Amino acid sequence: MAKKYFGTDGVRGEVGQFPITPDFVLKLGYAAGQVLVQHDTDQKPTVLIGKDTRISGYMLEAALVAGFTAAGVNVVQTGPLPTPGVAYLTRALRLSAGVMISASHNAYSDNGIKFFAEGGVKLSDEIELEIEAKIDEEMKTQPSARLGRARRISGADDRYIEFCKSTFPSHSDLRGLKLVIDTANGAGYGVAPKVFHELGAQVVSIGDEPNGYNINEKCGATYTKTLQAAVLQHEADYGIALDGDGDRLMMVDKNGKVYDGDSLIYVIAKARAREGINIGGVVGTVMTNMAMEIALKEQGVDFCRAKVGDRYVLEQLNQRSWLIGGEASGHILCMDKHNTGDGIISALQVLAALQTLNQDLATVCADWQPYPQTMINVRIQKGQKWQEASKDVLAEVEKELEGKGRVVLRASGTEPVVRVMVEARQADWARDGAERIASAIGSL
């Protein structure tokens, strides 16, 4: 059954436009609360709610709290905390569920609601459908004796900081390294610099002055120019960029070169292979560069592709019992460290890997050069038959690139666009193919 409200990563949209309105989020909290009460009959469920730094987070948090407590669910509020921190605390505190209020890398004018089940794992499709089925039902507030309570907890940041630090090798530290940390004026501003500082690094913190409106604005993992300039200015060894909710990572070396998720996954996997750690293999996506796949196999590391989206990478990792996976966008999963993507922990694993290999980022990543990719986003209207419109041109381009490249077309799960990606050994082949396919789709 198709989902009505949940996308690939929860419920997301522009604030003030359906479904990111106070009245809908109230109903969403109430519906989710009803499902929790039905599934947790032994005791009153408790939900953890975290958020990033968007101004709308206050409004949406209040609506969620009202919905959950009206359904008879207790609520624990952390304030600003990265998404992986919410997942961790949901598990560590043995709570019934966790909720993150964030639109990740989007502008402040967007927001979203992401749920975690007991244990800090993402909700199953079945539970999301159960919640959706109850959203349109009439709200019936529990009797006063059964209402939930809401409270804020102190020390959430500190618990998450200690957890992140525990994933770094106990016999080592970061002394001697100068790092620039860009937290995108987002959820990680209060925790990320402390993690690296407490492990011994000299830290320069930027993107750490959120005002409710500047999250992801010319900073963070989706805009690395600010970090690149800061690394050069401060003569730092590396720069680390998170996105607004702290689950993505990009890194910059001392020369200002940017390393995306693919490169960082390769570094981690190569070091684990060198140490003789059996990671099973690496899960990438249909967007992962072909050159990386070849380089991993040369290191004796198996590789497979999942659909785009960290939830699909996670599904493949769980099915195969593999440990490492992720996307070029900076979502990186190290399953032996955390059960969800975590920008801070991923950066620690990269730095630990570089110590293991006794090399810098540039040297390790020189093992492979990405095939040139051209990515074009084509806006579409709901119901447009873009697959039919692009069928003939797609067949032509795929035939031309056989053995020399590949094509990936996919509809975004969060916005009305089709992403056209063409990868080839030569940049002009990729650019020409992508433009032809995008033109065919755009002609609708």
Swiss-Prot record:
Mg(2+) binds at residues 104, 243, 245, 247. It comes from the Bacteria. Binds 1 Mg(2+) ion per subunit. Keywords: Isomerase, Magnesium, Metal-binding, Phosphoprotein. One of its GO terms (molecular function) is phosphomannomutase activity. The modification Phosphoserine is found at residue 104. The active site is at residue 104. It is an enzyme of class 5 (isomerase). Activated by phosphorylation. Its cofactor is Mg(2+). GO terms for biological process: carbohydrate metabolic process; peptidoglycan biosynthetic process; UDP-N-acetylglucosamine biosynthetic process. Its EC number is 5.4.2.10. GO terms for cellular component: cytosol. It catalyses: alpha-D-glucosamine 1-phosphate = D-glucosamine 6-phosphate. SUPFAM superfamilies: Phosphoglucomutase, C-terminal domain, Phosphoglucomutase, first 3 domains. Belongs to the phosphohexose mutase family. Catalyzes the conversion of glucosamine-6-phosphate to glucosamine-1-phosphate. This is Phosphoglucosamine mutase. It comes from Neisseria meningitidis serogroup A / serotype 4A (strain DSM 15465 / Z2491).
